[in-house]
């Protein structure tokens, strides 16, 4: 999962 901006989940 990732946000459409910057941060991404550690998935």
Curated annotation (Swiss-Prot):
Its main location: secreted. The keyword Cytoplasm does not apply. GO terms for molecular function: ion channel regulator activity; toxin activity. GO terms for cellular component: extracellular region. Contains 2 disulfide bonds that can be either 'C1-C3, C2-C4' or 'C1-C4, C2-C3', since these disulfide connectivities have been observed for conotoxins with cysteine framework V (for examples, see AC P0DQQ7 and AC P81755). The modification Asparagine amide is found at residue 11. Keywords: Amidation, Disulfide bond, Ion channel impairing toxin, Secreted, Toxin. It is found in: Secreted. Expressed by the venom duct. The cysteine framework is V (CC-CC). Probable toxin that inhibits ion channels. This is Conotoxin Ama1309. It comes from Conus amadis (Amadis cone).
């Amino acid at each position: 999962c990732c946000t459409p901006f910057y941060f991404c989940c550690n998935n």
